[in-house]
Amino acid sequence: MFPFTQLRTVLLAFALPAFLPAVALAQSAEREVDVELVLAVDVSRSMGAEEMDIQRRGYAAALTDPQVLDAMFSGLTGRVAITFMEWAGDGNQHVVVPWREIASPEDAQAFADLLLAGPSYNMRYTSISGAILTATRLFDDNGFAGLKRVIDVSGDGPNNQGVPVEEARDLAVGNGIIINGLPLMTTGGFYGRYSIPYLDRYYVDCVIGGPASFSLPVKSWGEFPEAVRRKLVLELAGHAMPESELPVVRVAQEEKTDCLIGERLLLQWDFNDR
């Protein structure tokens, strides 16, 4: 019998060409920007209407914040490109605001207005890997050539559907994409059957990757707007931050997280419910 792990590797290898970036970044059809940024936001069933509204409003406010605007326009080209995507289970990803160039405060306000105007709804399961793979495809033929390409993933639980999150992360990083994380630890110490108390460590070990990648945990919804603002300043700044200043959760080597914990929890509870 063909081993499952080998089969999965072969399938990913065949899928790889679909994720390769455009060959010529300098083509005249592509607009040069300092950063191409995918904001990938969790809307799985654990998110209620109020939480989803907080997320949308938090990003809209941050994108028009003076410090964030300064970061956007501080690079070599003085402009960035951003898209906003909501995600849940594998195959459940929805682009709320397509790629838009932001080169002025008016551009940023227009993006924020679109973000607040779009409908929001939640979906089943949590596929961080699906979000990363979909976000990776969004860079292809998007009309922009960024000096840096970043996927920002926010979520309140571990991956429990789709390919293993480490494989999706490694594929994106191998294509020159940086993945940053915003783990939402906003339950006040109460955890559901599919959640884990060490989501901050999980994001560091299993989700983020690439040069100067970072994870910025959010411990309460009251912290969310400021966390998003700070994260965007770091991601959009035209200069690299010293690694010592990046807000990464540091963990000891021996505390390496089980990156399949979400899948194991899902199997455990599905089996118990039979």
Annotate the PLM regions:
Residues 75-114, 191-204:
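Short beta-strand-loop
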Residues 216-274:
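C-terminal "exit" segments of structured domains
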Residues 9-21:
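Bacterial N-terminal signal peptides
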Residues 40-50, 82, 98, 114-125, ...:
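Second-shell loop/turn segments in exported
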Residues 20-28:
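Sec/Tat signal peptide C-region and signal peptidase I cleavage site
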Residues 158-205:
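VWA/integrin I-like adhesion module and closely mimicked acidic/polar interface patches used
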Residues 31-98, 106-154, 181-191, 198, ...:
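Von Willebrand factor
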